[in-house]
């Protein structure tokens, strides 16, 4: 289905059938995008394992869209490069430099 493979924004919910855990992971990852995903289940432990296998920058379990300013925001694949918010965002705005000084040199 086209809605499952394109990155659309809006209030939209796409619901799809799947046969097992491997099938749902395969379908979730079968796109060039990977901004976010949401998993809903009574089995939070299973959701946590599945979340690690989904190629998305953010995965919500039993919620969707809630976040905290200290948690990095960003996607995988064509859904963005880098992260906003949190300590990871500082790397995007920082250029690291190393300066070496020989304090024992007689000049």
Short names for language-model regions:
Residues 1-107:
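Conserved C-terminal structural/oligomerization subdomain of aldehyde/semialdehyde dehydrogenase
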